[in-house]
UniProtKB/Swiss-Prot annotation:
Its main location: cytoplasm. Residues 256-352 are annotated as: Head domain (RuvB-H). Residues 1-182 are annotated as: Large ATPase domain (RuvB-L). One of its GO terms (molecular function) is ATP hydrolysis activity. Belongs to the RuvB family. This is Holliday junction branch migration complex subunit RuvB. The gene is ruvB. Its EC number is 3.6.4.-. Keywords: ATP-binding, Cytoplasm, DNA damage, DNA recombination, DNA repair, DNA-binding, Hydrolase, Nucleotide-binding. One of its GO terms (biological process) is DNA repair.
Length: 352
């Protein structure tokens, strides 16, 4: 049975756990050092001037702490925060209700901001730039627009697909911060801290083993920790040992590099079914039985980071590392992507 660890949003229990372990001060936020150092300067300067912080765009793969940092920004600014997500803002009226309820210096956090409808996005432009919105009263021949001033606020947008933001929206963010994957050593510290909050002990080498297979992502590390706790408790053990950690990871089919069943299926399909590529994302999604957006947002970034996959103008291409691990040479006949022993040179540009 396949257990989803990567492409499932946090459930209620996980959300409560994330709230428990969520730091509330910038100095307690682990990792992303350059990003947080810069934000400290911008926040301090805004507070010294008595201004609202410039609008902030937080981008990067899921599970790296974008939502956590949005709440920390509000805490550091001493401001209230209202949170929503792009898909929920399906009408301009929904956004107008949020904007008119903001007080001076408040934070409006929009997760998945790239999924806002274009009409709603355009409604944000004047709000972000001039702190005003236009509201339509009545309809038909008697319709008229009324301009309302709103209090200066800070929009914090989070996205896993910054390339899908329109240029006008992206240009209105004064602060653009990109999240990177975490190093295993830092994830080990995060796991040890989280285990103490969970109320279960963990051996350092067990924490390190889990960290090394967490794809550089704190959310995945915490999910694996909770599953390891389950195995330990069922076995009547009060501390997660390396043996328990290994048992957990093996049962969940998480390998030494953090690849799960779907990662391997994607790479096996590209290497053996499509002879290494290039293959378009639509064809790949149909072949592996996964949503296109999920492949692009969840699986591809790490496969590229791990050196297995490249995106080119013609499609997805497997790398030499991918062939060395996944190639079935009886199918390929010694050819690498149909190039007789050598991989094509590829660029890093986006493909459809």
């Amino acid at each position: 049975m396949r257990i989803e660890l990567l492409n499932t949003p946090p459930d209620a229990a996980e959300s409560r756990f994330e709230e428990q372990i969520r730091p509330i001060r910038m100095e307690d936020f682990a990792g992303q050092q350059r990003l947080t150092d810069n934000l400290k300067v911008f926040i301090s300067a805004a507070k010294m001037r008595g201004d609202a912080l410039d609008h902030v765009l937080l981008s990067g793969p899921p599970g790296l702490g974008k939502t956590t940092l949005a709440y920390i920004i509000a805490s550091e600014m001493g401001s209230s925060i209202k949170a929503t997500s792009g898909p929920l803002l399906d009408k301009a009226g929904n956004l107008a209700g949020l904007l008119t309820g903001l007080q001076k210096g408040d934070i409006l956090f929009i997760d998945e901001i790239h999924r806002m409808p274009p009409m709603v996005e355009e409604y944000l432009y004047s709000a972000m730039e001039d702190f005003r919105i236009d509201i339509m009263l009545d309809s038909g021949p008697s319709a008229r627009a009324v301009q309302l001033r709103i209090e200066p606020f800070t929009l914090v947008g989070a996205t896993t697909r910054s390339g899908l933001l329109t240029s006008p929206l992206r240009a209105r963010f004064g602060i653009n911060s990109r999240f990177d994957y975490y190093e295993p050593e830092l994830l080990t510290r995060i796991i040890i801290r989280a285990s103490s909050i969970l109320g279960i002990g963990i051996e350092p080498d067990a924490a390190a083993e889990i960290a090394g297979r967490s794809r550089g992502t704190p959310r995945i590390a915490n999910r694996l920790l909770r599953r390891a706790r389950d195995f330990a408790q069922v076995d009547g053990i009060s501390t997660i040992t390396r043996t328990i950690a290994m048992k957990t990871l093996e049962c969940l089919e998480i390998d030494e590099e953090g690849l799960d069943e779907m990662d391997k299926k994607i790479m096996d399909t590209i290497v053996n079914k499509f002879s290494g590529g290039p293959v378009g994302i639509a064809s790949l999604a149909v072949s592996v039985g996964e949503e296109r957006d999920t492949i692009e947002e969840v699986y591809e970034p790490y496969l590229i980071q791990a050196g297995y996959l490249a995106r080119t103008t013609r499609g997805r291409v497997a790398t030499r590392k991918a062939f060395s691990r996944f190639a079935d040479h009886t199918l390929l006949g010694g050819n690498f992507g149909g190039h007789k022993g050598s991989l094509p040179l590829f660029d890093e540009s986006e493909a459809d």
